[in-house]
Curated annotation (Swiss-Prot):
<dbReference type="GO" id="GO:0003735">
    <property type="term" value="F:structural constituent of ribosome"/>
</dbReference>
<feature type="region of interest" description="Disordered">
    <location>
        <begin position="160"/>
        <end position="186"/>
    </location>
</feature>
<protein>
    <recommendedName>
        <fullName>Large ribosomal subunit protein eL15</fullName>
    </recommendedName>
</protein>
<keyword id="KW-0963">Cytoplasm</keyword>
<dbReference type="GO" id="GO:0002181">
    <property type="term" value="P:cytoplasmic translation"/>
</dbReference>
<dbReference type="GO" id="GO:0022625">
    <property type="term" value="C:cytosolic large ribosomal subunit"/>
</dbReference>
<comment type="similarity">
    <text>Belongs to the eukaryotic ribosomal protein eL15 family.</text>
</comment>
<keyword id="KW-0687">Ribonucleoprotein</keyword>
<keyword id="KW-0689">Ribosomal protein</keyword>
<dbReference type="Pfam" id="PF00827">
    <property type="entry name" value="Ribosomal_L15e"/>
</dbReference>
<comment type="subunit">
    <text>Component of the large ribosomal subunit (LSU). Mature N.crassa ribosomes consist of a small (40S) and a large (60S) subunit. The 40S small subunit contains 1 molecule of ribosomal RNA (18S rRNA) and at least 32 different proteins. The large 60S subunit contains 3 rRNA molecules (26S, 5.8S and 5S rRNA) and at least 42 different proteins.</text>
</comment>
<dbReference type="InterPro" id="IPR024794">
    <property type="entry name" value="Rbsml_eL15_core_dom_sf"/>
</dbReference>
<dbReference type="InterPro" id="IPR012678">
    <property type="entry name" value="Ribosomal_uL23/eL15/eS24_sf"/>
</dbReference>
<feature type="compositionally biased region" description="Basic residues">
    <location>
        <begin position="169"/>
        <end position="186"/>
    </location>
</feature>
<comment type="function">
    <text>Component of the ribosome, a large ribonucleoprotein complex responsible for the synthesis of proteins in the cell. The small ribosomal subunit (SSU) binds messenger RNAs (mRNAs) and translates the encoded message by selecting cognate aminoacyl-transfer RNA (tRNA) molecules. The large subunit (LSU) contains the ribosomal catalytic site termed the peptidyl transferase center (PTC), which catalyzes the formation of peptide bonds, thereby polymerizing the amino acids delivered by tRNAs into a polypeptide chain.</text>
</comment>
<dbReference type="InterPro" id="IPR020925">
    <property type="entry name" value="Ribosomal_eL15_CS"/>
</dbReference>
<dbReference type="InterPro" id="IPR000439">
    <property type="entry name" value="Ribosomal_eL15"/>
</dbReference>
Length: 203
């Protein structure tokens, strides 16, 4: 077994004494650092590699801290002006994950880089901490690598803001199978198809 396999097995048992101690120490360290900061290397190299990270030029790791909990509706003094069913302010649940929020914030900070993926590293009662893998589309090592140079294409600018990363797709309800026929090809396209009168010649 290689070293990464051992790391992977360690991470699977998060309640073990070793990992609990490690997470507690790291959590204290992360609380002292800035909300978004660059990491010299991934703290979970096995997970980072599974998500596409390579330890070579052009790949960057950023850490982000996101406050836990729901999203309060931003209305002045709780005045929502509408039907009683839409008057909720406090106990609303955000439809996207905190991980996608972390990706978006890092992507906004590093606008010249492309967000590839992200993963959980720690959490406490107030915050969740994530590491985001970014790729430099201007770097020659990226542009010449056929496995990653798809991300150089301009259509992949700010993937994280458009729900195109792994965690972003999850909140869009996209999947395969009979349960996803309302969202297959995108929910707006499905709505349009269902609401467009189509009169075939032979029907």
């Amino acid at each position: 077994m290689g070293a990464l396999k051992y790391l992977e097995e360690l991470q699977k048992k998060k309640q073990s004494d070793v990992v609990r101690f490690l997470l507690r120490v790291r959590c204290w360290e992360l609380r002292q650092l800035n909300v978004i900061h660059r990491a010299s290397r991934p703290s979970r190299p096995d997970k980072a590699r599974r998500l596409g990270y390579k330890a070579k030029q052009g790949y960057v790791i950023y850490r982000a801290r996101v406050r836990r909990g729901g999203r309060k509706k931003p209305v002045p003094k709780g005045a929502t002006y509408g039907k009683p069913t839409n008057q909720g302010v406090n106990q609303l649940k955000y439809q996207r994950s905190l991980k996608s929020t972390a990706e978006e914030r890092v992507g906004r900070r590093c606008a010249n880089l492309r967000v590839l993926n992200s993963y959980w590293i720690n959490q406490d009662s107030t915050y969740k901490y994530f590491e985001v893998i970014l790729v430099d589309p201007q770097h020659k090592a990226i542009r010449r690598d056929p496995r990653i140079n798809w991300i150089v294409n301009p259509v992949h600018k700010h993937r994280e803001s458009r729900g195109l990363t792994s965690t972003g797709k999850r909140s869009r309800g996209l999947n395969k199978g009979h349960r996803y026929n309302k969202t297959r090809a995108g929910r707006r396209k499905t709505w349009k198809r269902h609401n467009t009168l189509s009169l075939w010649r032979y029907r």
